């Protein structure tokens, strides 16, 4: 059984490590730059998406919506952080890898779109007021469930609605900047 002084020493060490890590973490003042660069980042996402938008919207033969009002409601509500985080992960890990399988030109543009989305996610994480979350979003689970059921058509649906996703990102981040 370790002595109480050894345990105390370990606790002091861990507290010091945590304090030094927190000191090197970006502060709220560093988020000011993010708030200023967000419109440009969203514009770059929209421009990158415009290069594949027609391809995926022409292939999307479904009348139903994948990105529904309930997802936007989650973005606007207390689950906004988690919904945004999960949707970025969903597009990066499930949708875009499948979307890249439609020829070299499409792959190049989808890859560029994915890189821009990864950059946005990284900047959101650095500014903790935008992504301080851990709960699960039921609306995101619904999107993933419908996407899976649609199989190949799910890729067309999800990619054809990527502009809606960008709008939801903008709604969420604009709301967070006002808080």
UniProtKB/Swiss-Prot annotation:
Domain of life: Eukaryota
Protein name from the UniProt record: Interleukin-10
GO CC, any one term: extracellular region
PANTHER family: INTERLEUKIN-10, INTERLEUKIN-19-RELATED
Disulfide bonds: 31-127, 81-133
Residues bearing attached sugar chains per UniProt: 135
One GO biological process term: positive regulation of DNA-templated transcription
SUPFAM superfamilies: 4-helical cytokines (SSF47266)
Lineage: Eukaryota, Metazoa, Chordata, Craniata, Vertebrata
Family of this protein: Belongs to the IL-10 family.
SMART domains assigned to the protein according to its UniProt record, in alphabetical order: IL10
Gene3D superfamilies tied to this protein: 1.20.1250.10
Record key words, sorted: Cytokine, Disulfide bond, Glycoprotein, Secreted, Signal
Role of this protein: Major immune regulatory cytokine that acts on many cells of the immune system where it has profound anti-inflammatory functions, limiting excessive tissue disruption caused by inflammation. Mechanistically, IL10 binds to its heterotetrameric receptor comprising IL10RA and IL10RB leading to JAK1 and STAT2-mediated phosphorylation of STAT3. In turn, STAT3 translocates to the nucleus where it drives expression of anti-inflammatory mediators.
Signal sequence residues: 1-19
The organism of origin for this protein: Cervus elaphus (Red deer)
Chief location category: secreted
Subunit structure: Homodimer. Interacts with IL10RA and IL10RB.
Entry-linked InterPro entries: 4_helix_cytokine-like_core, IL-10, IL-10/19/20/24/26, IL-10_CS
